[in-house]
Amino acid sequence: PPAAWNGGRTVTGAVRREFIDFIIRQYNSRGIPIRYTFTNPLIKEIHLTDPFCNMITRIAENGLNEIIVNVPVLEDYIRKNYPRYPLISSTVKQIEDRDALLAELEKDYKLVVLDYNWNNRFDELETLPHKDKIEILVNPYCTPHCKRRKKHYEFLGERQFEHNLQVFGNEKQALKPIPKKEFPCPNMSFDFYDTTGFETHVSPQQIYEKYVPMGYENFKIEGRLMHPADILESYMYYMVKPEYRDMLRLKM
């Protein structure tokens, strides 16, 4: 927080440079890349010079860390100015057309995060090329084929700009309260297990019995800003055998 380029969720607050360095170091020392989610759909050329976004991009450019991109103007800027970053195509693009997806898979991306509406359409998934380049979003919180999803992403992007100005703007902007706005969506109050009833939900059994045998190997858990209990449950569900979950819950 509060990077203006951030998308998908509105991240508020502020963070010190020392803490950013600490987080990057802790992940990278274990061989784990950090992945910036620079997918704000409202980014224009005027936002490319944002000092905070360029600072955090510069200090993490080491060939290991990654960036998720959505808007071409920012993608081109990153490719030109920070060429060591592997880039990932965002699910925010909402690519449901097969021909458009095939074209996306041929581009120079490390991964393409599949639109969740492709999930569990096994006959079609079987025929897709470059399965090792596709990442599956396994627990989408959004309603399948939601007609307001694009507007919701734009609303969150606008809110991100407002929070960025409050932290980094001039004195007048910093003192100006952020207008109270809401995007009414019942899914915002869902917990992890509410999402398991969606047709787009991918269970651990499906991962191992369907997706992996097909050749898929990249899976993404949604919910980075959910309640810690929800995040914990999603990790338990996908990464811990059922007989060990209660024991680990107590230890964590």
Residue ranges of model-derived segments:
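Active-site pocket-lining/capping segments in soluble small-molecule metabolic enzymes
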Residues: P1-L101, Y109-M252
